[in-house]
UniProtKB/Swiss-Prot annotation:
Substrate binds at residues 81, 87, 119, 153. GO terms for molecular function: L-malate dehydrogenase (NAD+) activity. It catalyses: (S)-malate + NAD(+) = oxaloacetate + NADH + H(+). One of its GO terms (biological process) is tricarboxylic acid cycle. Homodimer. Coiled coil: none annotated. It comes from Shewanella piezotolerans (strain WP3 / JCM 13877). The gene is mdh. Keywords: NAD, Oxidoreductase, Tricarboxylic acid cycle. This is Malate dehydrogenase. It comes from the Bacteria. PROSITE patterns: MDH. GO terms for cellular component: cytoplasm.
């Protein structure tokens, strides 16, 4: 199993690479690419960790060598948020980065499962899809927007608010991956009830959690460590699905035939072909139904921005 991380010298990329080096199945290969010249050194550093995962690093303008034979490609390349920026401010820089990297994926590893981490995910996934379509290799079951950070935040915040063991808390998060498009389905959590005020407060905190980290780091970065953990969890789930493990389910932002938008985050079953099945997200509360309906114009505009960028 070969996993490639594009953007591996960044804050998310290095955290993700460390976690993958320690958690990928024995015999796996981990390929690190970044434009930054430090990248081969990151690979050497990681290679000293005693796990049976071979690590190689590649730097420069061309990621082709890193992508050859990749089963999974995780893209975290781009600039991070700074105070005062929202995810859409990142579009002007990160859109071109994602386009160029996905063009290389299309040429070098067209069958790989591609997980997009680079923000704004609502838009960058649409960009990736259009690039793959232009190259004639688009398979909607092999492209994912990684929204796992919204899931782990939801689980963490709910457990803290209710005094629960976080390992026992499971939350589906639907919609997109920025602001009001992030919708945790708190009404579905088994054995837990919330007041209307708690639901509103938790939902808002989950939606604004990225800003919470950006402000707390005071200009020194964004959510890199928690995002690295979230991306590792999702990447390992992709690998487990590829290896034939049954019942691997994660929420992801996919082209899954949603009635709501061309791309929509919801639970999916992962397998040997990527998405094996898109699962219905089930019954929602009145609050959640209203929030879902209210987000759709924003989500669709984000998607259209990505489509138009490639055209």
């Amino acid at each position: 199993m070969k996993v490639a991380v594009l953007g591996a010298a960044g804050g998310i990329g290095q955290a993700l690479a460390l976690l993958l080096k320690t958690q990928l199945p024995a015999g796996s290969k981990l390929s690190l690419y970044d434009i930054a010249p430090v990248t081969p050194g990151v690979a050497v550093d990681l290679s000293h960790i005693p796990t049976d995962v071979e690590v190689k690093g590649f730097a420069g303008e061309d990621p082709t060598a890193a992508l050859e034979g990749a089963d999974v490609v995780l893209i975290s390349a781009g600039v991070a948020r700074k105070p005062g920026m929202d995810r859409s401010d990142l579009f002007n820089i990160n859109a071109g980065i994602v386009r160029n990297l996905v063009e290389k994926c299309a040429a070098t590893s067209p069958k790989a499962l591609i997980g997009i981490i680079t923000n704004p995910v609502n838009t960058t996934v649409a960009i990736a899809a259009e690039v793959l379509k232009k190259a004639g290799v688009y398979d909607k079951n092999r492209l994912f927007g990684v929204t796992t950070l919204d899931v782990i935040r939801s689980e963490t915040f709910v457990a803290a608010a209710k005094g629960l063991n976080v390992a026992d808390v499971k939350v589906n998060v639907i919609g997109g991956h920025s602001g009001v498009t992030i919708l945790p389905l708190l009404s579905q959590i088994e054995g837990v009830s919330f007041t209307d005020e708690e639901v509103a407060a938790l939902t808002t905190r989950i939606q604004n959690a990225g800003t919470e980290v950006v402000e707390a780091k005071a200009g020194g970065g964004s959510a890199t460590l928690s995002m690295g953990q979230a991306a590792c969890r999702f990447g390992l789930s992709l690998v487990r699905g590829l290896q034939g493990e049954a019942n691997v389910v994660e929420c992801a932002y996919v082209d899954g035939g949603s009635e709501h938008a061309e791309f929509f985050a919801q639970p999916v079953v992962l397998g040997k072909n990527g998405v094996e099945q898109v699962l219905a997200y089930g019954d929602v509360s009145a609050f959640e139904a209203n929030a879902r309906d209210a987000m759709l114009d924003t989500l669709k505009a984000d998607i259209d921005l990505g489509i138009e960028f490639v055209k």
